[in-house]
Amino acid sequence: MNKKPKKQRLDDLLVEQGAFPDRDAALRAVMAREVRVDDVYVASAAQLVRPDADIFLKGRKQFVSRGGRKLQGALDAFSQDVAGMNCLDIGSSTGGFTDCLLQAGAARVAALDVNYGQLAWKIRQDARVNVFERTNIKEADPALLGAPFDLIVIDVSFIGLASLAPLFPHFSRPGTVFIGLVKPQFESAHDETDRGVVRDEAVRRRTVEEVGAALADAGFGVTGTIESPITGPEGNVEYLVRAVFRK
């Protein structure tokens, strides 16, 4: 049996999930009765809540992790309709991307991750989600996952998207849309980072171009790139790239 996730202060959790830039902003929202947890208004920003609790912010969507905001930014920027789509989420982790897809109307999401027990209960229990834990995309059976997919999204760490690009056609059909989070810190050389952060914009741009080239070699045509609406760990600037499978 998995242990229940440790409770956190609400204001810390809201900042961690990318809902607010700092604790002061989160506090103001709580005091203004703009935050509900499990459908109940919270009176104190210091209240302890579960990381997988249903948190609602007045006037905007909320996701189980800050990754959802990144993908939502891409869907908005690329005018990407997800309604009715069969989707693959590579590196699902807590489920931020999957949550975003479900809220956007996806018919089904195959949530794949090499780890176990990270997916939020809200996502895990959704009938539209098929969970594939302890599963590496390099070894996954496309048919078992439900390929071909209409949309593939990916958010992984400690490995570059460029190195994974040759795998994506196995899960695609002509017209499959790909949206990937490019993390320059995992695409660049070690000596191009400063304590894990890529500070040189030229290096960051180069990594995006290299991912685009790898996707092109795999049969995808890149249609757009944006800077992520929120930064990654330690302030890393990240990017989202959209491509369409042509072959």
Where are each of the predicted segments found?
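A short glycine-rich, Lys/Arg-flanked "PGG" loop and its adjoining helix->strand segment in the class I
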Residues: A162-I179
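Core SAM-dependent methyltransferase catalytic element
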Residues: I230-K247
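Conserved SAM-binding loop of SAM-dependent methyltransferases across substrates and taxa
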Residues: T94-G105
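S-adenosyl-L-methionine
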Residues: A110-S163
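Glycine-rich helix-loop-beta junction characteristic of Rossmann-like nucleotide cofactor-binding loops
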Residues: D76-A83, L145-G146
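Conserved class I S-adenosyl-L-methionine
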Residues: V82-S93
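Short, glycine-/aromatic-enriched active-site segment of Class I SAM-dependent methyltransferases
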Residues: P184-D200
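A basic, amphipathic helix-loop patch mediating RNA/tRNA/ribosome contacts
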Residues: M1-A53
